């Protein structure tokens, strides 16, 4: 691994600690030794919508969380992180392809931080209106459904949880835990 990539992975890892173990998100590093993490598994606790089939009909229903994998390729940060929904069914949203791949509302820039990219992705899951891509959506059916129902204040945004960051003390504690062998790094005891 090139030094430049290692430096960037480490910088992103430390930034990601600012959103570790929040009410809306926990994550674990699943590929690469921290802080040189190349793949994250995110457990998201935000209310959203999914499309399901029952008795020959498709219906949109609420979901209360999902699991997402974030992969950083060897050519990262020149190529955007790949974000893939592992939960079935995936989120039903204009910025998410029906197979569960995230399509950001704005192009990736190598100067962008992974943390900010993940926060924008979380904003789409909770239907933040400023992040809905209507010009070139990944999922046209989801866009049609959203435009038909967006006036329903009870539905949108689908979750009013603020996407806040950890305090400096919480971030420092998360860093100590993440870099200490055998210690817990999230609330479920997963290392």
Regions of interest found by a model, annotated:
Residues 1-65, 75-191:
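UBC/E2-like fold recognition across ubiquitin and ubiquitin-like conjugation systems
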């Amino acid at each position: 691994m090139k030094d430049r990539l290692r430096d960037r992975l480490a910088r992103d890892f430390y930034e990601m600690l600012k959103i570790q173990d929040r009410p809306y998100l926990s994550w674990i590093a699943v590929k690469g030794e921290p802080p040189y993490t190349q793949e994250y598994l995110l457990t998201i606790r935000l209310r959203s919508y999914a499309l399901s089939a029952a008795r020959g009909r498709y219906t949109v229903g609420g979901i209360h969380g999902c699991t997402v994998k974030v992969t950083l390729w060897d050519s990262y940060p020149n190529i955007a992180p790949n974000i893939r929904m592992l939960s079935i069914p995936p989120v039903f949203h204009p910025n998410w392809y029906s197979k569960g791949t995230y399509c950001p509302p704005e192009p990736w820039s190598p100067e962008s931080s992974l943390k900010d990219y993940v926060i924008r992705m979380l904003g789409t899951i909770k239907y933040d209106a400023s992040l809905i891509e209507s010009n070139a959506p990944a999922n046209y059916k989801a866009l049609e459904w959203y435009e038909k129902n967006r006036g329903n204040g009870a539905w949108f945004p689908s979750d009013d949880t603020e996407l806040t960051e950890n305090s400096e003390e919480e971030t420092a504690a998360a860093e100590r835990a993440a870099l200490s062998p055998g210690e817990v790094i999230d609330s479920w005891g997963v290392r």
